[in-house]
A protein has these predicted regions:
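A short, structural micro-pattern
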Residues: 1, 50, 107-111
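Internal, well-folded beta-alpha domain core
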Residues: 71, 81-220
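Residue-level signal for secondary-structure boundary sites
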Residues: 15-17, 64, 123-125
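Beta-strand elements of well-folded, non-transmembrane domains
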Residues: 9-13, 60, 115-123
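Residue-level detector of short, conserved catalytic/binding motifs and their immediate flanks
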Residues: 5, 54, 113
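Glycine/small-residue-rich interface belts in oligomeric ring/scaffold proteins
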Residues: 21, 26-71
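N-terminal, Lys/Arg- and Ser/Thr-rich interaction peptides
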Residues: 1-23, 207
Length: 220
C-alpha cells in the first residue's frame, strides 16, 4: 500500500511541451503527470521508492502568453564527444553566434496546482528502508522547502515553488465546471526497455478542476 502526500506548487510561467509542436514550443493546458512526478523527485528521490501521481488540482485558471526566446538550432552529439575522446581533431562546442535562432513559445502564466501523490517501495529498497522513514524525510523537506535540485514546470528556466499542502478542501478555478475534455496528453515515458524508450498517453478529462489519474487508460 502506498503512502500519500499533497504538495502545493506555483510559479510565474510553465511550459509542458506538446510533442507535436517540435520547433516552436506550445504548452499543454495543464501540468502533465510526468512533470508532476519530476517535481516530487526533485524534492526527494531514492532507488528504494517510486512516486505515483493520483490527482492534479488546477488551482489557478489556465492562461497563456506568447514569448520569443533565443535558442540554438544544433546540439553536441555523443558520437562527436567519443571521437574527440579518441583523438579526433574537431571542435567540441556550439557557437551561439552561428547557431542562435529566435523561436516563439506559447507558455502558461501564473500557474498553481496541488499534486496528490503516493510512493511505493521498490525491489531496490534495502533492509533499513521503510515507508515511515521515507515519509518523515519527505514531510520534513516539504515543510522546510528543501529539495535535491530546484523543481521546475516543464523547462528548467521556469522555477516551481513548493510547500506541503495540509488543506482537506482544495479549491480550484474550475469548481463550477463539471467536466472539460483536454484531449490526449503525455502521461509519462516507459523506461522498461532502455534501448527503446516509449511515450505513454492518456485522455485527459478535468472534472471540477481535478485530473484524476488513478484509473485512467494509458495508451502506448
Amino acid at each position: 500500500m502506498g503512502v500519500g502526500v499533497k504538495v502545493r506548487v506555483w510559479g510565474n510561467y510553465a511550459l509542458f511541451s506538446r510533442p507535436e509542436m517540435k520547433v516552436e514550443r506550445g504548452s499543454y493546458d495543464v501540468m502533465t503527470p510526468s512533470a508532476a512526478r519530476g517535481i516530487l523527485e526533485a524534492v526527494y528521490w531514492h532507488p528504494g521508492m517510486r512516486w505515483a501521481i493520483d490527482k492534479i488540482h488546477v488551482v489557478n485558471p489556465v492562461q497563456f502568453t506568447s514569448v520569443r526566446r533565443n535558442e540554438v538550432k544544433s546540439k553536441i552529439l555523443a558520437s562527436n564527444v567519443l571521437q574527440v575522446y579518441n583523438g579526433a581533431k574537431k571542435p567540441l562546442y556550439i557557437s551561439t553566434k552561428a547557431d542562435i535562432v529566435q523561436r516563439a513559445s506559447l507558455l502558461l502564466r501564473d500557474v498553481e496546482y496541488v499534486i496528490e501523490a503516493h510512493f511505493e517501495m521498490t525491489e531496490r529498497a534495502n533492509e533499513t528502508d521503510n515507508p515511515g522513514k521515507f515519509k518523515d524525510i519527505i514531510m520534513r523537506r516539504l515543510r522546510r522547502g528543501e529539495c535535491f535540485h530546484m523543481p521546475y514546470f516543464g523547462c528548467r528556466e521556469f522555477q516551481a515553488n513548493f510547500c506541503l499542502c495540509e488543506e482537506e478542501d482544495i479549491r480550484t478555478a474550475y469548481d463550477e465546471v463539471e467536466e472539460k475534455d483536454l484531449g490526449f496528453m503525455l502521461f509519462d515515458m516507459d523506461y522498461s526497455d532502455r534501448n527503446s524508450i516509449q511515450p505513454m498517453f492518456f485522455r485527459a478529462v478535468m472534472k471540477r478542476g481535478v485530473l484524476d489519474l488513478r484509473d485512467c487508460e494509458v495508451i502506448r
